[in-house]
Amino acid sequence: MLTERQLLILQTIIDDFIGSAQPVGSRTLAKKDEITYSSATIRNEMADLEELGFIEKTHSSSGRVPSEKGYRFYVDHLLAPQNLPNDEIVQIKDLFVERIFEAEKIAQQSAQILSELTNYTAIVLGPKLSTNKLKNVQIVPLDRQTAVAIIVTDTGHVQSKTITVPESVDLSDLEKMVNILNEKLSGVPMSELHNKIFKEIVTVLRGYVHNYDSAIKMLDGTFQVPLSEKIYFGGKANMLSQPEFHDIHKVRSLLTMIDNEAEFYDILRHKQVGIQVKIGRENSATAMEDCSLISATYSIGEEQLGTIAILGPTRMQYSRVISLLQLFTRQFTDGLKK
């Protein structure tokens, strides 16, 4: 159990190191307004904190830096919520004011904005389409031969594709098809659409659409959509600006991993609900042993739909990043409920 004095000194060391990236010595601490102890007392407490494994000495300086154990204690017990500037709150909320909530577009933009606000790497795992339910279908003619099919799900995912309209299918047929599809398929999981169309809907269409065979062929292409999650990155190269990663050998394996999107897909798809913080070697990947990964899930009710994560050095601005992720996931969840 740490004393109040040790808690204050540990928190001040970590806060200072997060901001400066420089080892912290007793002289630096003695100049802090919140530290009212003598240099000798500070040195003694730092020695005890080092012996307990919360801070450690570097080879190049007489100062101390937080250890992984120190960061973990800091995150679990010392972290205070950070109020975000109003302009950042407005910037984030503006993402989610669109009348039609396009989850994939928002996910992509979220990754970019988060990377800019933090100067770290942002990763967003979009909703898994197979668990979405169809909300509605639109088929908008462009000319006599082509149209745009727009599929909207209950989570706000919008999938559009250009389709070829057979000459034998007229506008009246298109309108009847869309009405039948929306009446019969609204609320059906995307993973079941194809089977339901060809086991049930075709029978209904036969009684309403003149050129039945051509219409069915067109429908087959319309509902061939990818069902797996998409992963979006923002600021892939941001880690290069962090002093911890100026060593080219250290950063090469990390950048290789970031470029291998499938590896991050596996890391993020099984995240637990809520905010999760993995520090250093708590991460399963060796390339991330000098990094922290903070992730947050967004959901509707009890259904987890996706994950937003920030990858940075262990010397990360934990409080700020957590506040940003909480705001993003709150806005994302509210947007999906529209």
From Swiss-Prot:
One of its GO terms (biological process) is negative regulation of DNA-templated transcription. Disulfide bonds: none annotated. Transmembrane segments: none annotated. Pfam families: HrcA. The keyword Amino-acid biosynthesis does not apply. One of its GO terms (molecular function) is DNA binding. Keywords: Repressor, Stress response, Transcription, Transcription regulation. SUPFAM superfamilies: GAF domain-like, Winged helix' DNA-binding domain. Negative regulator of class I heat shock genes (grpE-dnaK-dnaJ and groELS operons). Prevents heat-shock induction of these operons. Belongs to the HrcA family. This is Heat-inducible transcription repressor HrcA. It comes from Bacillus anthracis.
